């Protein structure tokens, strides 16, 4: 018989940097989860992701206070800032003030990283999804309609 689920916790934690301080500690403590055990297993699971990239995680908490978790890929906006804007932030007025240019190749690279978490049917649809995010951040998109 499957374990009884008592809750889900959604957090965004920097890869390889989970520690018991807020927001991790209080969120897990409310559900009675062993915080140190989660931090160690999360840091181990995210060791192949670049350290410091915000990584969404969905934690499933069971009645016996055990847990399991699923890590997702970093948000598209974070990847766009990293690869296209080189750390700068997006535009406050994206329709009038452009802050950078994204090539189709850059968008394709990000789309390939995000494919497991996107609902896109194919790579082309994933590229268009990432291009939409880029446009909403004030990034000019080249080579994508």
UniProtKB/Swiss-Prot annotation:
InterPro entries attached to this UniProt entry: Ribosomal_uL11, Ribosomal_uL11_bac-typ, Ribosomal_uL11_C, Ribosomal_uL11_C_sf, Ribosomal_uL11_CS, Ribosomal_uL11_N, Ribosomal_uL11_N_sf
Instruction: Give GO BP annotations, semicolon-separated.
Output: translation
Identify the PROSITE patterns for this entry. RIBOSOMAL_L11 (PS00359)
For this UniProt entry, what's an example GO CC term? cytosolic large ribosomal subunit
User: Can you summarize the PTM annotation of this record?
Assistant: One or more lysine residues are methylated.
Q: Name one Pfam family in it.
A: Ribosomal_L11_N
Q: Does the keyword DNA-binding apply?
A: no
> Which GO terms label this protein's molecular function in UniProt?
large ribosomal subunit rRNA binding; structural constituent of ribosome
Q: Which UniProt keywords apply?
A: Methylation, Ribonucleoprotein, Ribosomal protein, RNA-binding, rRNA-binding
What NCBIfam families does the entry give? L11_bact
Q: What does this protein do?
A: Forms part of the ribosomal stalk which helps the ribosome interact with GTP-bound translation factors.
PANTHER family, per this entry? 60S RIBOSOMAL PROTEIN L12 (PTHR11661), LARGE RIBOSOMAL SUBUNIT PROTEIN UL11M (PTHR11661:SF1)
The entry describes its oligomerization and partners as:
Part of the ribosomal stalk of the 50S ribosomal subunit. Interacts with L10 and the large rRNA to form the base of the stalk. L10 forms an elongated spine to which L12 dimers bind in a sequential fashion forming a multimeric L10(L12)X complex.
Q: Which family would the database say this protein is a member of?
A: Belongs to the universal ribosomal protein uL11 family.
For this entry, the protein name equals Large ribosomal subunit protein uL11
Primary gene name: rplK
